[in-house]
Regions:
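Conserved N-terminal beta1-alpha1 strand-loop-helix module at the mouth
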Residues: 1-87, 107, 155, 166-167, ...
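Glycine-rich beta-to-alpha transition loops that act as phosphate-gripper elements at the mouths
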Residues: 21-23, 70-78, 94-97, 114-119, ...
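Histidine/lysine/aspartate-rich catalytic loop segments that bind and position anionic ligands
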Residues: 91, 95-140
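Conserved functional loop/turn residues at catalytic and ligand-binding sites
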Residues: 39, 88, 96, 109, ...
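Catalytic cores of alpha/beta
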Residues: 31, 77-87, 120-128, 164-180
């Protein structure tokens, strides 16, 4: 059984979380399989996916914990978070701050990533026990928001989500992101049923992030 610290390290080292939004549970599973085949381990199934909890349970039963790191996204409350953890999620991501969700995840020693947009919100999330703080919607400010927050809070582990793509992912990493959350720019091929494209895009993201990390280390 992998610990929370080990799972956090896996996310940080890979530098990316695949954010899965889909029109059906079947499509979500295919996307998850494609991004995994492309080398991405951390896969976030959002609660907007029909049957999202069953998708999480299916993935948890299909793959070993060292093969895939399943998370639940768009989680708004502690009740939903607990259901997802029981289904097999190893981390919980929220677009906003909810103290009860953070408490619950810490109770079960699972990773929790609440959403924030300002230094005040990030600090509040960290003080409440957040492991990583999701910066959302990141596209409103671009990579400079990471630099701005890490000015007074250099210790803050930040996960920008929204607006991250192959053309700018290097900028987000250079700015100091813990990792990046990528949705449509990664999984867009699924809309036309091209899961090979999703796999190829995942490979490109992994390559670019690794290259950027090597250059900045």
């Amino acid at each position: 059984m992998m610990s929370k610290i080990e799972n956090l390290k896996r996310i940080e080292e890979s530098g990316i979380v695949a954010v899965v939004r889909a029109e059906s549970s079947e499509q979500a599973l295919k996307i998850a399989e494609a991004v995994k085949a492309g080398g991405i381990q951390a896969i976030e199934i959002t609660m907007t996916v029909p049957g999202a909890v069953e998708v999480i349970r299916d993935l948890a039963q299909t793959y070993k914990k060292n093969e895939i790191l399943i998370g639940a996204g768009s989680v708004l409350d502690a009740e939903t978070a607990r259901i997802c953890l029981l289904a097999g999620a190893e981390y919980i991501v929220s677009p906003a701050f909810d103290i009860e969700t953070i408490k619950l995840c810490n109770r079960y020693q699972k990773i929790v990533m609440p959403g924030a947009m300002s230094v005040t919100e990030v600090l509040r999330a960290m003080e409440a026990g957040a492991d990583v703080v999701k910066i959302f919607p990141a596209e409103l400010f671009g990579p400079k928001i990471i630099e701005a927050i890490k000015g007074p809070l250099p210790q803050a582990p930040l996960l920008p989500t929204g607006g991250v793509n192959l053309n700018n992912v290097d900028q987000w990493i250079i700015a100091g992101s813990f990792a990046v959350g990528v949705g449509g720019a990664l999984t867009g091929g699924a809309k036309k049923g091209d899961y090979d494209e999703v796999k190829r895009t995942a490979i490109e993201f992994i390559k670019k992030i690794k290259s950027t990390k090597n250059q900045t280390s």
